[in-house]
């Protein structure tokens, strides 16, 4: 086995010195003790995790760990998708959506050792606007919150920060008109957000699509229609209660392929990373596109 570890020194450690060195030393020590051939790399910029993972694949890695948050996992996953190299996760972000869905331990040594011993599995990948995602994507309000949340370059970025940003933006955000073509039907919606879920949750235990499965060959489309800010805030508690399907103005469907159109360019996110797209976005699922290893 040849293992590579790609470390994001910023994830979960903004402003703390020496994090990259400590994480690299820990990973190297664990893999050396396990007798595993390895390479440990630290990212230096956005997009670097993808480059390092591609390099690891070219050098014969059979397992590449992403040590970071959802964005780091997305970059490494994109580098490994449709190939024979498996993804391992050492969660260190603010949401850790895919890691939570896979029940990956937060403790780095447990995550490392557990994945080394685990059997490989495959999960689906989603695609929207030409960008792959493995946990969730979204259009509208949740994409705006992702952009606002990620613009914070220092300090803590946990659940409280996310909820604070969302609550503040909710009172000025206007729902938009969308045309959604899915499963041979076309619908028109004035929506707060349109989520595409590969897994059940955004992260931090916020369940957006309770019926989603990582290996069912489908995406879960969730449309949250526009309502008053106070009504949305009241219903938002259901994200933490796993009861969102019971909320008024929430539409859910399984889909393999869909198109979303609007009159203005669409802001969307892939695994929490915001992207500005055109006025039409096509989304699809790629069944079994990514190999993973997770602790049993």
Regions picked out by a protein language model, each given a short descriptive name:
Residues 151-161, 205, 210-231:
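Gly/Ser/Thr-rich active-site loops/lids in small-molecule metabolic enzymes
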Residues 7-9, 68, 225, 262:
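Short beta-strand/turn micro-motifs composed of small residues
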Residues 182, 188, 213, 223-296:
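ATP/nucleoside-binding phosphotransfer catalytic cores, i.e., glycine-rich phosphate-binding loops
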Residues 138, 142, 195-209, 274:
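Glycine-rich phosphate/pyrophosphate-binding beta-alpha loops
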Residues 10, 33-34, 43, 81-86, ...:
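Catalytic core of DAGKc-family lipid kinases
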Residues 1-64, 74:
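ATP/NTP phosphate-donor binding region
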Residues 71-85:
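Short Gly/Thr/Asp-enriched flexible loops that form oxyanion-binding sites at enzyme active sites
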Residues 49, 70, 194:
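Short conserved active-site loop signatures built around small residues
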């Amino acid at each position: 086995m040849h293992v590579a570890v790609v470390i994001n020194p910023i994830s979960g450690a903004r402003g703390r010195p020496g994090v990259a060195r400590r994480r690299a030393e820990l990973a190297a020590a664990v893999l050396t003790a396990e007798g595993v051939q390895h390479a440990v790399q630290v990212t230096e910029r956005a997009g670097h995790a993808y480059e390092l993972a591609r390099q690891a694949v070219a050098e014969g890695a059979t397992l590449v760990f992403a040590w970071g948050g959802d964005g780091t996992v997305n970059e490494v996953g994109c580098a490994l998708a449709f190939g024979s190299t498996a993804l391992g996760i050492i969660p260190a972000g603010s949401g850790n959506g895919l890691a939570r869905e896979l029940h990956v331990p937060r403790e780095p040594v447990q995550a490392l050792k557990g994945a080394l011993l685990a059997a490989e599995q495959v999960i689906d990948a989603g695609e929207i606007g030409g960008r792959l995602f493995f946990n969730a994507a979204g259009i509208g309000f949740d994409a705006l919150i992702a952009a606002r949340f990620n613009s914070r370059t220092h300090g803590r970025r946990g659940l409280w920060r996310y909820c604070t940003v969302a609550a503040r933006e909710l009172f000025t955000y206007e729902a938009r008109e969308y045309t959604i073509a899915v499963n041979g039907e076309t619908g028109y919606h004035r929506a707060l957000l349109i989520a595409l879920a590969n897994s059940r949750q955004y992260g931090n235990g916020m369940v957006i699509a309770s019926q989603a499965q990582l290996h069912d060959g489908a995406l879960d489309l969730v449309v949250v229609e526009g309502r008053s800010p106070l009504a949305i805030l009241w219903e938002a508690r259901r994200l933490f209660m796993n009861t969102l399907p019971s909320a008024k103005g929430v539409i859910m469907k399984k889909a393999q392929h869909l198109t979303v159109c609007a009159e203005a360019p669409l802001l969307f996110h892939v695994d929490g990373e915001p992207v500005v797209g055109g006025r039409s976005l096509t989304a699809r699922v790629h069944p079994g596109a990514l190999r993973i290893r997770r602790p049993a």
